[in-house]
Design a protein with these regions (language model features):
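Active-site neighborhood of thiol-dependent amide/isopeptide-bond enzymes
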Residues: 121-206
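His-Asp-centered catalytic microenvironments across diverse enzyme cores
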Residues: 145-146, 178, 186-195, 199, ...
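Secondary-structure boundary elements
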Residues: 2-160, 245-248, 255
């Protein structure tokens, strides 16, 4: 008889250690958080501790515990009920399914709501199939609109029904993560053919990353209007908030964020 799986067995120790370090630095802030964690299940409490251990200080100060609880509870539910999610490498699950932040967007509860809205549409699908279907759902709910305001939260993009590419990709990444599909935003800070930039989405399945245009569904992965443009880009990068980098080439840091070079997936590169 197989032994029961242990939630985050490989990373439990470092999560606890990093959480305690954060709490030591901000004792007055973490005292009420610790009280609320005692009322959670062991798995949900550990998921919350991961979020608090690696989130920016601004998130700790700006948002109540209940916001992060939504992300933690949804992540644990997916891990318990979806074998595909439970089989993910822990670092992929932590960074690209559980984690609440995508880029510099506002944070608001959304994961449980998105899962209830999308869940029936992807029943029985693998990650590849689910990613395509989720993107169709995202296209039904939001379309492109150029704005210069601060990046909205995923739920705000959903309610407003539109957003610029950075907001569409934040929305799509959250929708994908809400149903257990590992996802992240990637960004080309400057096109070579014009004075502009673009953000889109990558999903992880079968041990590899694939791309798609946020709210721009295609019938296959690795296809988008930006395919040719990205092949001439000077840089395409993703962001990770954890200090233990899942994989990839580190090209720099910005505060507690690490930038990873993703250009080789789109263009011919040379070491």
């Amino acid at each position: 008889m197989a032994e029961p799986r242990v939630f985050l067995k490989e990373n439990r120790g470092r999560i606890e250690e990093n959480y305690l370090e954060q709490a030591k630095n901000l004792p007055r802030v973490f005292a009420p958080v610790d009280e609320k964690l005692q009322k959670c299940t062991e798995e949900v409490a550990l998921a919350c501790k991961y979020l608090y251990a690696f989130m920016p200080y601004s998130d700790i100060g700006n948002y109540p515990f209940e916001v992060f609880l939504d992300y933690a509870e949804n992540g644990v539910k997916l891990w318990k009920e979806n074998p595909q999610v439970a089989d993910l490498p822990e670092e992929i699950f932590l960074n690209y399914v559980l984690f609440h932040r995508v880029n510099e967007e506002e944070i608001a509860q959304c994961r449980t709501y998105f899962r209830t809205e999308i869940g029936s549409r992807i029943q029985g699908m693998n990650f590849r199939e689910a990613a395509l279907e989720v993107n169709y759902w995202c296209a039904e709910e939001a379309t492109y609109h150029c704005t210069d305001d601060r990046t909205l939260s995923a739920i705000s993009v959903y309610r407003r029904g539109n957003g610029r590419c950075g907001e569409e990709s934040v929305f799509t990444v959250n929708a994908l993560r809400s149903v257990g599909v590992p996802a992240r935003q990637v960004y080309a800070p400057k096109w070579s053919h014009c004075d502009d930039n673009h953000a889109w989405v990558e999903i992880w399945c079968d041990g590899k990353w694939y791309f798609l245009g946020a709210c721009e569904p295609e019938e296959i992965l690795n296809k988008g209007w930006f395919t040719n443009a990205s092949s001439r880009a000077m840089m395409i990068h993703s962001r990770v908030f954890d200090t233990k980098i899942p994989e990839g080439e580190v090209i720099g840091t910005d505060g507690m964020v690490t930038m990873l070079n993703e250009l080789k997936r789109y263009a011919v590169t040379k070491e």
